[in-house]
Amino acid sequence: MEDNSEQASVSSQASMRPLVSDNGDREAGAGVEVNIANDNDTSVGVDGENGNEDDDPILSKYHNACQRGDLEVVREMIHGGQVNVSSDADREGVTGLHWAAINNRLNVVDFLVREGANVESKAGALEATPLHWAARYGFVYVVDYLLQHGASATTTDKQGFNLLHLSVNSSNIMLVVYVLFFVVSKGIIDIDYVDPKGRTALLWAAYQGDSLTVAALIKFNASVKIADEGGFTPLHWGTVKGQPHVLKYLIQDGADFFQKTNDNKDCFVIAEEMSNTHSFQEALRHNNFDKNGYPINKLVKRDDHAKIITFLIPLLVLGFAFFGFSHLHILFALPVIILLLLASNKFIKSFLLPSYETKGTNSASLLKSPLIAGILFGSIFWLAFVWILRILPYTFTKRPLGNLTFCAILCFVCYSLFLLAFSDPGHIGSENDHEKIRETISNLLKEGKFDTRSFCLETWVRKPLRSKYSYLNDALILRFDHYCPWIYNDVGLKNHKLFIFFILALELGIFSFVKVCLKYFDELDMDGDCFILGDDDLCSGLIGDRFTFLIMTWACIQAVWIFSLVIVQLFQITKGLTNSELNALIREGRRVDIDSQTHNEFFNTVPEGFINNKDTEEEAAPPVRNNTNERISTTFSGNLPKPRTCMGMICAVTGLHQCVAIIKDTFGIARHGSSRSTNTRSLLSSISTDYGWRRNWCDFWLLSDTNTPLWKRIFFSPPSTKALLNGKEADYATLYEVPNKNHGSVSQLQELQDPLSEIDDMV
């Protein structure tokens, strides 16, 4: 039975594979050879050239020129009468337009179409049009051009594939998005159109393990219920592939994992046969199903209630820990506290996190829960508790100023923590108007910037520079700095300044608390020998009030990472970059052996020679070599991401890895500890928003409204999406180009210096 089942699965997978030949469907199953005319040219050809050199050398030369994008040769041959564009096909029907389309030669495509080339001519064993050839390799700009010049999106090849199927098969998410909005949204092609074997675009995307395409198709209401001729639904094929994100999306959209194929197999059987049980069960857990597919009963029914409980648990655990270590022997207290921590961790992970609402494929985690914010709140609570009930009565008469100072800082910290937790970091929400989205895509295509750097796949809006999508807020965060677990919110344009005041107040508050604590311990006047603590105030505190002593020690430990955070934040302000941008620079510095010409993580298929007058040399998108042996892919490994180690989580929470990176860069230490070579570029040398420390600080601390009083400009956060950048007001919601740091005008310098003069006068 097992052998028959495995054989059935193998045969089902074999039937699933499309008939694809990398020579553009010219000969089914024929091999591809990449023609390299020179080091900078990569073209798709067959058998070294175009396969017909012996038949017609002139036609062969013409087709080779179309492949290479040699517009001058193509123009000369057509205008010279050597080739007639209306009859330039070889014996297989392949035209110059086919070769130009499959090699992403938009300039040649444009010329041939203007000369009268037939955009609907079919070629090869699959009878594919130039549009099909371009779509199979994800060339968005060629597809857009051909559609605008008469190519039909509904035409199918011999396999029964239309433009939507071929776009999905290309695994270029940008082409899929383009087809969805310009073809499917207009009703030209049905989202659930099936090929002759009953397979929809969603079914193909699931089989390919293409999570981005699956998510996009589901947003367009693609059916997860339709089964092909073998009884396989998208979830069945997704289980065959085992890509976790694909499975999560499909189950989240209501796919039936109990449904059986014609071979009487459900997803559980297929997952076991394909060794994808772990990924499948992870997807089930993500959507609140147990390993058998039955709903998990939630201990807490509401998401907000579960988060409140998570937030309050550290308050109780910290109090119990301080009490235990101060009243019990350490050999008894330590194992009890460890067991309490383990039990709390197990309770949160098993009963509270499953009650959280999940968004997309992001599962709830401790780092993305209110737990860390609860630790900060609990620490502040117990610190305030001992100050009010124990320290204040002893020290107020002798240290009134110190106590009043601490009280003021404590009130500000509590108030700002509340504001930060519920603040708007500055966001752009999702766009639902398809007409506006089409306009955005069209503008990006004209500028040669239609890729994931400039277009947000989650919100369907153009990405402003320095923005980043946040799953927590389900929006693009303007001038995104980082997600801070200590406030359970993102830090961005509108709350970044308050965040800086908050962490500065925390550090000053701890320093002030330690001072009044030491005075309190001095008032206790307890004598004793405390080994390394000696017989001073610390020893008096340890003997006389261990509970308060432990809280002061805990506060000092927190002061270490807060100081690290303050240093990193002030350094970033000085350099004119955000935490997110610093992380990106660190990641870029760790990359090795990546060919920038072939590595295309942003799915950019802008043709070589694409002219965009708006682009500066610095901002222009890098050219992408059109090597069709290296398909653009939005698929990911079937393996789940590695969980954070304990040290990794500590570094993520405290930002210590950034301090290390800054120190290494400052002292010129290379990655492996050796001196930085002259060929190694500094991490911080390519910051496009670094206009000098003086200007950077003014850009950050001053509001852009010059009519506002100076003290408000310094202490208030931006009320809108506008802020200073290089001394001029910039709207971060529409920030698509940064001011050139080398061409500041006199008016910009004057506007920058005026506030500084006011500050000097005040001092």
From Swiss-Prot:
Transmembrane segment boundaries: 308-325, 331-348, 369-389, 402-422, 498-518, 547-567
Pfam families: Ank_2, DHHC
Subcellular location, record wording: Early endosome membrane; Golgi apparatus membrane
SMART domains, alphabetized: ANK
Catalytic site: 484
Occurrences of domain DHHC (ranges): 454-504
Catalysed reactions, semicolon-separated: L-cysteinyl-[protein] + hexadecanoyl-CoA = S-hexadecanoyl-L-cysteinyl-[protein] + CoA
Lumenal compartment segments: 326-330, 390-401, 519-546
InterPro entries on file: Ankyrin_rpt, Ankyrin_rpt-contain_sf, Palmitoyltrfase_DHHC
Biased composition (Polar residues): 1-15
Principal EC category: transferase
Role of this protein: Palmitoyltransferase specific for casein kinase 1.
Protein name: Palmitoyltransferase AKR1
Name of encoding gene: AKR1
